[in-house]
Curated annotation (Swiss-Prot):
GO terms for molecular function: serine-type endopeptidase activity. GO terms for cellular component: plasma membrane. Belongs to the peptidase S1C family. The active site is at H504, D534, S619. Residues 126-137, 247-262, 331-347, 365-390 have a biased composition (Polar residues). Residues 680-733 form the PDZ domain. It is found in: Cell membrane. Keywords: Cell membrane, Hydrolase, Membrane, Protease, Serine protease, Transmembrane, Transmembrane helix. It comes from Staphylococcus aureus (strain COL). The chain crosses the membrane at residues 410-430. The keyword Protease applies. This is Serine protease HtrA-like.
Length: 769
């Protein structure tokens, strides 16, 4: 969000600050209004009409100005902090560089001084050893003088070291001088106490200790004065001289040892300073001063302290000095000569120990430097290697972490996947085998069911013989004697059997020979027959329990392609119980039938088509579905050259309607309208002109004759009328007219007819009763 003056902040932060600013401003304004109201109520002044508002500047402008000023102040503070941090970093770096340079310079100088001191001390040692045999006082004084000079030189070197360490940088000069002065004061105080304790030994020893204290407290320019004082001192007694020598040697050893330790500490602290960028030379010096102070507090400590390690040469030298001391003590030498030899021997041993300690410290320092540099190089190489590995192995590390976090779940998931694959393969194989077995089982079951249904149906199908009947099972078929057909037991009541068959099978004979599947025969009686439906009912009596009543199905639910079985007796008794298999080839077929064999079709039979094998003798046989239920009765087949397996069966629902009336009445009552008709398709051109038939009319019937007082006459139908539609159905010919009229045999309701009379179209209602 741009608020001006080159300040850009996020929109959410801008809205939050604006909301807080408005809230605070409204609260302040409400408080002011409340306070002004109290003042007005108390003073009852005329200031009640005073407008209590802030300036006319818009709230948003005030908020933007306030926010921009706040951001400017914050930026200034940030810049100042950055400047101070950069300055402090530069100062620390410069101070560190100076201290580091001074530390290196001091260490180099100290190494050179140590080497020079070792050479001088060795030469002096050999000279003093050669001069130790002398027993004169002059040589003893010379040796004592040289010893004092050596101690003064050591003190000078110590003061020079302290002086060099005290001026590493101008930045820390004042603080370091203060710390040194405080430490020297503490050292001087400790030395003063020691002097007071030893005051009983004589004025010479006290004067000498005060001079030593003054040497430690004085600065570098006063070293020459201390040397003069030492040279001008009076000779000391033997106990005082031994005590002084021992104290000086201890101080020198302590300085050398602490300096070596401080050098190692400086190196270790220098490594830490590289990571923190903070100089640490002053701290190392403080540690050195503290160690010196602690050691000086115990002047009586022996040289053989646990912190100092003696070499084999030192031990041999000590033993030699001890033997010489005993020898000199037992000798009849003077007290001065014994004193000088003993002081010389102790001085030599002290120098030897100092040399060995310095060598040991230098060796430790070199080892420490080598280890430090090696560690630094190793750290650098390790850091580079780690960076390279981190860059190259970042992805592998992520994968390892992911695996370590989720490996149980991943293992379980992999196991589940493998198990699913295995089970899938197993189940696929099993399912394949099951499907094969199911197919085989289905085929076996289908075959078993077919066989079962066939066996059950055979028990319900009988042979019907009529010697006087004529063959009329097919259109234009020649008449023959000794007709044999089939029948179906559709009902059984006790020993009474009701058999349905075709009307053309029973013919004109009332009695029929009924033969069962077990070759037993009985005589049956025809209860009724209907030539228009080609159905007849025969009643027979038999106590044979093998004869079964067939189960009735529903022909309204037939499906095209549905498998069926046909059971009958083709060609007579010799082939009784023949079973053929097929499917339903067609539904709602209108098959023309010639019952009286006059080469003229008499009726349209409503049937369904099957492709099962049907032969003479199958008429009246049973058509069952795969459940073994009766769905039709075989009625006819087309017997023409080049035509095969085209047979027809009457639906069982139509059969039930007919046999019910035949069983009770013996006949079927159809409505008769009392007319005779001709088909339009058979008219010639003169006949079409006579009835004034429009040219567009191609199908229908022409009324040729109307019976007086008949249903047609009562309905107003006249000769010459052309009927093209009946009961809402297209009328093709006179067979279709009879089929539509006979379909209303049960309700006998009036039906509508569309006719042409004198070339004009009109509708009339035809009565059926």
């Amino acid at each position: 969000m741009d608020i001006g003056k080159k300040h850009v902040i996020p929109k959410s932060q801008y809205r939050r600050k604006r909301r807080e600013f408005f809230h605070n401003e409204d609260r302040e304004e409400n408080l002011n209004q409340h306070q002004d109201k109290q003042n007005i109520d108390n003073t009852t002044s005329k200031k009640a009409d005073k407008q209590i508002h802030k300036d006319s500047i818009d709230k948003h402008e005030r908020f933007k100005n306030s926010l921009s000023s706040h951001l400017e102040q914050r930026n200034r503070d940030v810049n100042e902090n950055k400047a101070e941090e950069s300055k402090s970093n530069q100062d620390s770096k410069s101070a560190y560089n100076r201290d580091h340079y001074l530390t290196d310079d001091v260490s180099k100088k100290q190494n050179s001084l140590d080497s020079v001191d070792q050479d001088t001390e060795k030469s002096k040692y050999y000279e003093q050893n050669s001069e130790a045999t002398l027993s004169t006082k002059s040589t003893d004084k010379v040796e004592s003088t040289e010893m004092r000079k050596l101690s003064s030189d050591k003190n000078k070197v110590g003061h020079e070291e302290q002086h060099v360490l005290s001026k590493p940088s101008e930045h820390d000069k004042e603080t370091r001088i203060d710390s040194e002065s405080s430490r020297t004061d503490s050292d001087s105080s400790m030395q003063t106490e020691k002097i007071k304790k030893d005051s009983s030994d004589g004025n010479k020893s006290s004067n000498l200790k005060s001079e030593v204290i003054s040497d430690k407290s004085n600065t570098v320019p006063k070293l020459s004065e201390s040397d003069d004082e030492v040279n001008n001192q009076k000779p000391l007694t033997l106990p005082e001289e031994q005590k002084l020598k021992r104290q000086q040697s201890q101080n020198e050893q302590t300085k050398t040892y602490t300096y070596g330790d401080s050098e190692q500490n400086d190196k270790s602290n220098h490594e830490n300073d590289l990571s923190h960028h903070i100089p640490s030379i002053s701290d190392d010096k403080d540690n050195v001063m503290r160690e010196n102070h602690i050691v000086d507090d115990n002047p009586d400590n022996d040289i053989n302290t646990p912190s100092l390690s003696k070499t084999d040469d030192d031990r041999k030298l000590d033993e030699k000095i001890h033997v010489e001391d005993k020898h000199k003590q037992n000798a009849d030498s003077s007290e001065t000569v014994g004193y000088q030899s003993q002081s010389t021997a102790s001085h030599r041993s002290t120098e030897k120990r100092n040399i060995s300690i310095n060598d040991h410290d230098k060796l430790n320092g070199q080892k420490t430097n080598t280890k430090t540099s090696a560690n630094n190089n190793q750290k650098k190489a390790t850091s580079k290697l780690n960076k390279g590995r981190a860059t190259n192995n970042n992805y592998s590390d992520i994968l390892k972490k992911f695996w370590m976090m989720y490996w149980p779940k991943l293992v379980i998931l992999m196991g589940i996947i493998i198990l699913i694959v295995i089970l899938n393969a197993i189940f696929n194989n099993v399912n394949k085998n099951d499907r094969m077995n199911d197919n085989n089982d289905a085929d076996a079951q289908k075959y078993t069911t077919t066989m079962k249904n066939a066996n059950n149906t055979v028990k319900s199908v009988v042979t019907v013989e009529n010697e006087t009947s004529k063959d009329s099972s097919l259109p234009k078929d020649k008449a023959s004697q000794d007709e044999v057909g089939s029948g179906v037991v559709y009902k059984k009541s006790g020993d009474t059997l009701y058999i349905v068959t075709n009307a053309h099978v029973v013919g004109d004979k009332e009695n029929q020979k009924i033969t069962f599947s077990n070759n037993k025969s009985v005589v049956g009686k025809v209860l009724g027959k209907d030539k228009w439906s080609d159905l007849a009912v025969v009643k027979a009596t038999s106590s044979d329990s093998s004869v079964k009543e067939i189960a009735i199905g529903d022909s309204n639910n037939l499906v095209l392609g549905e498998p069926i079985l046909v059971v009958g007796n083709p060609l007579g008794v010799d082939f009784k119980g023949t079973v053929t298999e097929g499917i339903i080839s067609g539904l709602n077929r209108n098959v023309p039938i010639d019952f009286d064999k006059d080469n003229k079709y008499d009726m349209l039979m409503k049937a369904f088509q099957i492709d099962a094998s049907v032969n003479p003798g199958n008429s009246g046989g049973a058509v069952v579905n795969r459940e073994g239920k009766l769905i039709g009765v075989v009625a006819a087949k087309i017997s023409m050259p080049n035509v095969e397996n085209m047979s027809f069966a009457i639906p069982v629902n139509e059969v039930q309607k007919i046999v019910k009336d035949l069983e009770t009445k013996g006949k079927i009552d159809y409505p008769d309208v009392g007319v005779k008709m001709k088909n339009i398709a058979s008219l010639n051109s003169f006949e079409r002109q006579a009835v004034k038939l429009p040219g567009k009319v191609k199908n229908g019937v022409v009324v040729d004759q109307v019976d007086n007082n008949g249903l047609a006459d009562q309905s107003g139908l006249k000769k010459g009328d052309v009927i093209t539609e009946l009961d809402g159905k297209l009328l093709e010919d006179d067979l279709r007219f009879r089929q539509i009229i006979f379909s209303h045999k049960d309700d006998l309701k009036s039906i509508t007819a569309k006719i042409y009379r004198d070339g004009k179209e009109k509708e009339i209602n035809i009565k059926l009763k």
